[in-house]
Amino acid sequence: MTSTLDVSKVLGLLDQVLAERKASGDPEASYVAQLHHKGLNKILEKVGEEATETILAAKDAERSGNTDLLVCETADLLFHAMVMLSHLGSNTDAVMAELARRFDLSGLEEKASRK
């Protein structure tokens, strides 16, 4: 099993690669650079597609008890969400900071604070 430190390192390295591909990647040679080149609407289309595939994989996992496909689809969803964040000038550090802020709140308290 991967430790928390390893997960943070993976996310940080991926954030770095995404930023590099956005800044100077060749759309002919890099999928991420190609997504950035095509713009936000294409990136959002991919996020939506991956979200749908994740939902379908979750339903399959519930029936079969096998979460392998669900894990793969969730990784795809997270990856494309990270591309979206990168495209808009943010990264997973901001998301992790928000999750950390919410950690000491109950779900209902956190939801009420957004109103």
Swiss-Prot record:
The UniProt keywords, alphabetically, are:
Amino-acid biosynthesis, ATP-binding, Cytoplasm, Histidine biosynthesis, Hydrolase, Nucleotide-binding
Keyword Cytoplasm part of the UniProt annotation: yes
What would be one Gene Ontology cellular-component term for the protein? Answer: cytoplasm
Cross-referenced SUPFAM superfamilies: all-alpha NTP pyrophosphatases
| Highest taxon, organism lineage | Bacteria
- This entry's Enzyme Commission designation comes to 3.6.1.31
By sequence similarity, the record places it as follows: Belongs to the PRA-PH family.
The protein in question is named Phosphoribosyl-ATP pyrophosphatase
Q: Which organism is it from?
A: Saccharophagus degradans (strain 2-40 / ATCC 43961 / DSM 17024)
Identify the coding gene: hisE
